[in-house]
Amino acid sequence: KGVLSTMDIMIRQKEARVIFNETEPLYVWADEFKTEEVVTNYVSNALHHLDGEKIVEIKVQKQENRVKVTVFNTGTPIPEADLPNLWNKFYKVDKARTREYGGSGIGLSIVKAIMEGMNQQYGVQNFDNGVEFWFTLDRK
């Protein structure tokens, strides 16, 4: 929720519709600041690659012994050939588009380093109408 309030200006500039249905508090084993960095990265990327209905949907789902956080945005799916390289430092799928907003290509490599440092899972999934990035955290 804090990430969304810090990004409020960007959300309004992009005319995005952000959907975040709060659930009951979930307690996890994680570094608060590093987790916030991952969410910020995912939401920022979602806003930069927003298209179509301009929807960004954030979900926090309770699983058996984990919590799964997903950030979905409407837009063009990422080409399958690019998916394995997304987590590499300085990798950019669409260089021209990234130049428009000044992206450096290091955001997802930071996500990778944080999640691997916490021994957690992370990933991306294409849908017909957009892309979803996700990560998991162990529950307390």
How would you name each of these model-derived features?
Residues 12, 17-26:
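Conserved catalytic submotifs in the C-terminal HATPase_c
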Residues 35-36:
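A residue-level detector for a conserved hydrophobic packing site
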Residues 46-47:
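Short helix-loop "hinge" at the ATP-lid/N-box region of the Bergerat-fold HATPase_c
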Residues 52, 119-120:
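Conserved glycine-rich
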Residues 53-65:
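Short beta-strand/loop element within the Bergerat-fold HATPase_c
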Residues 78-92:
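Short conserved segment of the HATPase_c
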Residues 102, 107, 111:
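Short alpha-helical Gxxx[C/S/T] motif in the catalytic ATP-binding
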